């Protein structure tokens, strides 16, 4: 469809059949596998995208890979993405049938495909990446390189995300805060950022080091838009991990893992933010098979007991 930053361009948009590339003919001949590979893939029997999607799906059928994160998805047309998705769905079923004793063989979820397209966000809606490209989720650039709002104003984002994402089970957004392409979302209270991100509706991802307070590369210039010299892409801070911050992110992350309502449920504010009691909200989820409800408070003062009214979900005596 187009070339990315001068990198070689596979003509996936062309539908005519092509022969096996000379470089592979040479490689397979030298390996002594040419006849075997031609018998498997054919010679002059498919388009560029036919070959590429077949080869990529072999990672799935051979190793049981159950998902791809596809970078710069806009550089490949939707039909080729859909072709890849369909082949990978079939390949994963084959792997599970052929490897019944291996981990993941008894899972029933189809192959998952997440796409990345710069500036794509919740406002992009349930667009052609989903309907034509076969993507299950798209990365959400809404918060790229930016901290999430304070507890006093985060209800609007929670409500918007829940209303937009969780009203359509085929529309998924993968949200993050820090990025190697924009900035590290650092504030004086990264524990709160962990709470806000882990309690966000939809899917979330942790960019390495957000949970441990990783810094940029010392002494390396940063231009504010991706970083000159890749200062944002510093090594993981294994020797200087903020253990208190990590423990908090792990605690809230575990809560999210244990409660599907956090990411997939409907959102309701219980009490607006107050400096003395924080901000309290509920999430409810029921798909007819699984039912889950939670109430959470964030932004409350440290080391202070607060009373939370849970009667909207649980009556007295509920265990």
Set out the residue ranges of the language-model regions:
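Active-site-proximal helices and loops of the catalytic beta/alpha 8
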Residues: 54-173, 186-189, 195-200, 212-318
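Acidic/His-rich catalytic or pseudo-catalytic neighborhoods
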Residues: 45, 170, 176
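Substrate-binding/active-site clefts of carbohydrate-active enzymes
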Residues: 1-63, 84, 88, 93, ...
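Short, surface-exposed alpha-helical recognition segments that flank or form part
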Residues: 43-47, 185, 240
């Amino acid at each position: 469809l187009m070339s990315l930053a001068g990198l070689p361009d596979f003509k996936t948009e062309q539908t005519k059949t092509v022969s096996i590339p000379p470089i592979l003919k040479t490689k397979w001949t030298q390996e002594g596998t040419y006849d075997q590979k031609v018998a498997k893939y054919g010679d002059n029997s498919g388009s560029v995208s036919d070959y590429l999607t077949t080869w990529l799906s072999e990672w799935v059928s051979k190793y049981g890979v159950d998902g791809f994160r596809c970078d710069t998805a806009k550089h490949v047309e939707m039909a080729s993405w859909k072709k890849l998705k369909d082949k990978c769905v079939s390949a994963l079923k084959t792997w599970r049938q052929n490897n019944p004793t291996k981990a993941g063989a008894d899972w029933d979820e189809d192959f998952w495909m997440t796409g990345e397209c710069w500036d794509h966000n919740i406002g992009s809606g349930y667009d052609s990446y989903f309907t034509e490209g076969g993507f299950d989720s798209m990365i959400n650039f809404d918060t790229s390189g930016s901290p999430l709002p304070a507890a006093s104003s985060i209800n609007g984002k929670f409500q918007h995300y829940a209303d937009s994402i969780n009203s359509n089970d085929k529309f998924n957004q993968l949200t993050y805060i820090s990025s190697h392409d924009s900035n590290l979302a650092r504030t004086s209270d990264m524990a709160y950022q962990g709470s806000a991100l882990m309690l966000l509706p939809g899917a979330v991802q942790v960019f390495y080091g957000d949970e441990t307070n990783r810094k940029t590369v010392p002494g390396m210039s940063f231009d504010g838009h991706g970083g000159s010299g890749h200062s944002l892409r510093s090594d993981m801070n294994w020797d200087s991990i903020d253990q208190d911050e990590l423990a908090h992110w792990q605690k809230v992350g575990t809560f999210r893992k244990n409660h599907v309502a956090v990411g997939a449920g409907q959102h309701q504010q219980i009490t607006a933010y107050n400096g003395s009691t924080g901000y309290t909200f509920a999430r409810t989820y029921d798909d007819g098979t699984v039912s889950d409800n939670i109430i959470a408070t964030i932004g409350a003062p440290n080391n202070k007991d607060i009373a939370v009214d849970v009667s909207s979900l649980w009556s007295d005596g509920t265990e």
